[in-house]
Amino acid sequence: MKPRRWKTLARRDVVRDRWLRLRADRCELQPGVVLDPFYVMEEPDWVHTVALNATREILLVRQYRYPADVFTWELPGGWINAGEEPLVAAQRELREETGATASRWSFVAALHPNPARQTNRVHCFLAEEASVTSALELDATEAIECGFFSVSAVHGLIRDGSFSQATHVGLFHLALPRLGA
């Protein structure tokens, strides 16, 4: 059967706060087939950056992720503020989380992290000639460790499970052809 667009019959908020909106939708998948509830999570779009220093090492951040109860190495990034352009958000997040700036920026991709449940997209950028130029500007909810890693070391982190956020792994691999690795 050919897929078709679902029809929204009703929509109600389950949770709506500054972090996210969780909706319970009533959807008609095809005539006579209704799914109720179908949960949809709305969040702002995100940005992530593959930042390279002069020796082509990748700048990663390590932080604790409460829902999975794990410490993970990740790409620097975060939410795009209302009205903010993705590139500006990527530059801001890189500076805030790592104290780094970069002289050359290029767009890699914009992807849906989980189109089965979420409405947002993640925008990935490549930042070249990155260097740490200032102190971190962390929110009270953030505790972050930073480090530069070779491409082969990042592959090792993926294999041992310490760089395991799926969208970050995918974005890292999308950027690989541009890394000269």
Predicted regions and their residues:
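Extended interaction-bearing regions that mediate binding to partners or small molecules
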Residues: 1-15
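Residue-level detector of high-confidence beta-strand sites
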Residues: 11, 61-63, 110
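Short beta-strand micro-motifs in enzyme catalytic cores
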Residues: 21-25, 71, 121-123, 145
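Residue-level structural signal for beta-strand termini and adjacent loop
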Residues: 39-40, 64, 113
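Short, amphipathic C-terminal "tail helix"
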Residues: 169-181
